[in-house]
Amino acid sequence: MAMKKLLIASLLFSSATVYGAEGFVVKDIHFEGLQRVAVGAALLSMPVRTGDTVNDEDISNTIRALFATGNFEDVRVLRDGDTLLVQVKERPTIASITFSGNKSVKDDMLKQNLEASGVRVGESLDRTTLSDIEKGLEDFYYSVGKYSASVKAVVTPLPRNRVDLKLVFQEGVSAKIQQINIVGNHAFSTDELISHFQLRDEVPWWNVVGDRKYQKQKLAGDLETLRSYYLDRGYARFNIDSTQVSLTPDKKGIYITVNITEGDQYKLSGVQVSGNLAGHSAEIENLTKIEPGELYNGTKVTKMEDDIKKLLGRYGYAYPRVQSQPEINDADKTVKLRVNVDAGNRFYVRKIRFEGNDTSKDSVLRREMRQMEGAWLGSDLVDQGKERLNRLGYFETVDTDTQRVPGSPDQVDVVYKVKERNTGSFNFGIGYGTESGVSFQAGVQQDNWLGTGYSVGINGTKNDYQTYTELSVTNPYFTVDGVSLGGRIFYNDFQADDADLSDYTNKSYGTDVTLGFPINEYNTLRAGLGYVHNSLSNMQPQVAMWRYLNSMGEYPSNTNDRNSFSANDFTFNYGWTYNKLDRGFFPTEGTRVNLNGKVTIPGSDNEYYKATLDTATYVPIDDDHKWVVLGRTRWGYGDGIGGKEMPFYENFYAGGSSTVRGFQSNTIGPKAVYYPASSRHDGDDDYDNDCKSTETAPCKSDDAVGGNAMAVASLEFITPTPFISDKYANSVRTSFFWDVGTVWDTNWDSNAYAGYPDYSDPSNIRMSAGIALQWMSPLGPLVFSYAQPFKKYDGDKSEQFQFNIGKTW
């Protein structure tokens, strides 16, 4: 830049010596050296026109104006009689921009920074900016601890006054922190203070947060952490006097020294609130109560200010000002806090708008709102609307923006900005195990049908042992009050033997309808009726099955028709859901509890009840919610009524991707104990299980029969997915898990079957551990898991790798 100013000054001086002070009339203007710039464009940028009388000052202004266009590296103005001769050298045009050696900074980010400086392909190159760009990039590397980094701009001339611009990076290595010293600390040890830092001079293997690589930004954050640590413990006079960062001669090591003055501890003597409290003085004073002798705490003071703002925000005061001023009494070591509040104007909502909902209708979003148009602005109501939209599961992100109405002193518009996700899914599941081989299922689900909020699903399974189809429809707003109505019809042809379960065939069909009643923001009750017809055949004589048939008045001597049996049941279905998750898909905080149950009603062939309870709790362990602990449980229990047993085909099962991963689906728990062939009365002694027809005593097999009780739990640690940018953080999730579970039969008579496993024992717990990856793909959620069972029992079947599309728990 200094060179350009010097060049301009020299040209101005030379012009003055040529033209003199008297001036002359310009009859014509000629240009030399124009290539890319049109003559007309150059003339328009000049203050001189043909016919003007020009002097030295006019020539100086002309040169200055031509340089200001940014198109020229050199400008000379000469006189040829009455003609003004303008000689220019155009700046070269950038033909290409390339990067070499940059690993820490991506090409896209570099291009954005260059464009912000006016450096882009097709534009002219201002060489004077290159040194600033080089220095700016090197400063960035220095800020992240790479002090040996260098950046050089290489300009290669090309034909037709074009150049190739190449930025060559030598990033070097990150300087590592050799030692962090804190000088002046007496109340707390240096190790205690540094343990709260992100930067460390020593990092144990288990610490995934600490880092020895120096970064200027992290140091600033650590200094603020240090300040907060003292202020939160009563050291109101704490001060960071200075910070020194020293570099070793080889630029690979960093020494950090922080000089502090701790001061004394101070206690709060009182809080005085003043200002415009908008009639809410009592509520505000409740927020400022302190315990006698309480130490001064900076974080609590900040929280108190935020709580006052939130309180006023609930009453429409959208922009309150709250300032706390501590009055320190050094004599008695106390602090009196003076809080000044200015509630400002109360604001009313003119309009609620939605942006980004290209598929979902406005009415679908608007019915989730708790903030009303025309009412005063309630920050809590706006937040509730955001929570409800997130829990719908239709959107990847939901953001709110409160915009003041131009020209109005007390009106705002509330804008909800959503990014829709694909709510339709093609469900396809594949599992592979050493014993099970390959299994799969398929279906289609649309949770936001045509943007109406209706959930419509067609699901089915077709494989060697099952043909299942189901059509379901749910209207979440059957009434304006939010009462939902859902229904389904289904058909199932199930060959249990081919699924490694006990031997029987069940052809069933049915329907049910359910109403959901919202109790409050987080609780919903459900009630409905259902009908199902079950037609059983090919029943091999095993203990649990025969026990059920006996309770129904069906005995082996009466089952000569290939052991067939049918039942028609009418059920009362009920449920309860508590949902306080922060969003519908990939939640990071909150709890969800879901209870589902049914009981047969008069007119049914069976008499039983059955219920399941699912819970899930997400606990973030960092402020950004990238590291989350997830705990899940599933409980199930059912039994007969009036001396009857719950049907064996209603039993609970465990194992598979939705319960205990690493085990083949439905294989955990009690196994079939078959009666010997001589006890059968169907004339067929051909067994399709592990038992032989020559057996004379009940035979234990590996065929799972399930049980009337189930308990499953999972502890999951959700982590950021490696090599995935923040752009896709809401679409991909990685976790490490530990699953446990068991299924048992409370009606199993261990005395009658001594020598066989006690299937009534709930302590036969299976365990597995592994890693899972979930991806919200265009086809629906993809779930990959690899688990290794490390506690299993005889007859359990493992399935280490499991892959599902459209199935999550």
From Swiss-Prot:
This is Outer membrane protein assembly factor BamA. It is found in: Cell outer membrane. Residues 24-91, 92-172, 175-263, 266-344, 347-421 form the POTRA domain. InterPro entries: Bac_surfAg_D15, BamA/TamA_POTRA, D15-like, OM_assembly_BamA, POTRA. The keyword Repeat applies. It comes from the Bacteria. Part of the outer membrane protein assembly complex, which is involved in assembly and insertion of beta-barrel proteins into the outer membrane. Constitutes, with BamD, the core component of the assembly machinery. Gene3D superfamilies: membrane protein fhac, membrane protein fhac: a member of the omp85/tpsb transporter family. Keywords: Cell outer membrane, Membrane, Repeat, Signal, Transmembrane, Transmembrane beta strand. Coiled coil: none annotated. Belongs to the BamA family. PANTHER family: OUTER MEMBRANE PROTEIN ASSEMBLY FACTOR BAMA, SORTING AND ASSEMBLY MACHINERY SAMM50 PROTEIN FAMILY MEMBER. The keyword Calcium does not apply. Residues 1-20 form the signal peptide. Part of the Bam complex, which is composed of the outer membrane protein BamA, and four lipoproteins BamB, BamC, BamD and BamE.
